[in-house]
């Protein structure tokens, strides 16, 4: 369910414009939240009655949605590139 530091640093490098310290960029934050959401999806396939963790998942999804809304408002091009690379919307 959890991801290690190596996976996290790969995401930061990919979406942080090749800078490992660039963790505050909206794209990096959304990508990290997306990875956490995907990890929780597999958890819920096993543990369908885990309502406490489901509430945490909803909190993470809300944070990602707010960040995506901010990114779309500030830069539509960066928003579209991120959506395409993470395959979030169809």
Swiss-Prot record:
Gene Ontology annotations for the cellular component aspect, listed alphabetically: cytosolic small ribosomal subunit
Signal sequence extent: none
Gene Ontology MF terms: rRNA binding; structural constituent of ribosome
UniProt keywords, alphabetically: Ribonucleoprotein, Ribosomal protein, RNA-binding, rRNA-binding
Record's keyword annotation contains Transcription: no
Biological processes per GO annotation: translation
Top-rank taxon, per record: Bacteria
Pfam family, one: Ribosomal_S15
Alphabetical list of InterPro entries matching this protein: Ribosomal_uS15, Ribosomal_uS15_bac-type, uS15_NS1_RNA-bd_sf
Similarity comment text for this entry: Belongs to the universal ribosomal protein uS15 family.
Oligomer status and interactors: Part of the 30S ribosomal subunit. Forms a bridge to the 50S subunit in the 70S ribosome, contacting the 23S rRNA.
UniProt xrefs under PANTHER family: RIBOSOMAL PROTEIN S15, BACTERIAL AND ORGANELLAR (PTHR23321), SMALL RIBOSOMAL SUBUNIT PROTEIN US15M (PTHR23321:SF26)
Function: One of the primary rRNA binding proteins, it binds directly to 16S rRNA where it helps nucleate assembly of the platform of the 30S subunit by binding and bridging several RNA helices of the 16S rRNA.
Protein name (Swiss-Prot/TrEMBL): Small ribosomal subunit protein uS15
Species: Blochmanniella floridana
Gene: rpsO
């Amino acid at each position: 369910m959890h991801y290690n530091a190596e996976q996290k640093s790969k995401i930061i490098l990919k979406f942080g414009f090749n800078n490992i310290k660039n963790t505050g960029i909206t794209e990096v934050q959304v990508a990290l939240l997306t990875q956490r959401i995907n990890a929780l999806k597999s958890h819920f396939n096993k543990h369908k009655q885990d309502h406490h963790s489901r509430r945490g998942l909803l909190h993470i999804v809300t944070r990602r949605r707010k960040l995506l809304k901010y990114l779309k408002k500030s830069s539509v091009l960066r928003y579209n590139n991120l959506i395409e690379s993470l395959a979030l919307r169809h």
